[in-house]
Amino acid sequence: MPDGVLYLTCGIDTQDNRFEAEVVGWGIGKESWGIRYQRIYGDLKRGQVWADLDDFLSTTWKKRDGTELSIRAACMDSGGHFPDQVIRFCKEREDRHIWAIKGRGGMDVPYIRNPTKNNRVGGELFVLGVDTGKNAVLARLKVLIKGPNYCHFPAGQDAGYDENYFKMLTAEHKVTRWKGGRKVERWELKDPAQKRNEAFDIRNYATAALEISNPPGLEIPGEDLSLIHISE
């Protein structure tokens, strides 16, 4: 893991037969490094795959200088067919800053609101303005100079960053449509044949984990690095 990494977050997507997760490292100026993209397969109605996910989230990652870091914050999507199980899993791990999220579309929806416990499990649930977050992810992907907000990805496929990953990461684009006589911006798939977009969503969730936890030491004094809006 590169020495510039100071803080690790994780984004987790829940599918019917697997979890997909990405560990992202963050440095000064919110420069980021893709650390690992992982698929964890199993029957989500049984406990083993949840235990496997917990093991993955408990992994420590070693930097080149020997320093070990653990995942300090994670956001897990509660959409799909297992919302109660996701919220319960996260509730039991809130002390590890593992949070359940629920996406809400719309360009005017704030990226993050304060969590609620208005659910059957009584666990914290963050409503995530996913379109706002996608704007931030895309803005960072467009940064071409290494430094603040730049995104690094490892060479080779050993860490899960294969051709399919980058197809998913870039599967969507922002378009403008007319609705009711006014312009409306929305995110759509570029190619209907490329329907998988989990990598884009998961990088969004890992970014949300960073913003919710708001760790010190990543900002550059006097420089505005904010690409997103956090609602109180």
Segments from the language model and where they lie:
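Nucleic-acid-processing active sites and adjacent nucleic-acid-binding tracks
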Residues: M1, V5, D16-A73
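Short hydrophobic beta-strand that contains or immediately precedes a catalytic carboxylate
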Residues: T9-I12
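C-terminal nuclease/phosphodiesterase catalytic domains that cleave nucleic-acid phosphodiester bonds
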Residues: G79-L227
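Conserved small/polar residues in nucleotide/adenosyl-binding loops
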Residues: I228-E232
